[in-house]
């Protein structure tokens, strides 16, 4: 399981608890910058501050198979990502970073694995949607746009 752009880890915690990830033997890899330049759209998010990384890590302290990694995707993925992925959630709101994550991780997604693209259908992220749609089309995949504005791909 992988999430790129985990922010505070809320959705990852819900998935981890629902699946009882500790009992499955699976790992969960969470990535985020955890800090953003002043004036950007992300600086308006609640709880964004200098302790976000440590707070997010603490949220998963009881789950040793969950790794919270700080850095820029896709660079942080090198040597710090799983070989096989059953579930990939991408939520970085940045087209180049999301395409970089797909380039680095898509081949590791198992057949039948799920890829969720957050904000795929949200009108504020058309550049992201267009880039992802073209990327998947070039590989023979269609993105299903869900009513929640997420995109779903089953490999």
Q: What function would you assign to each model-found segment?
A:
Residues 1-155:
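S-adenosylmethionine/decaboxylated-SAM
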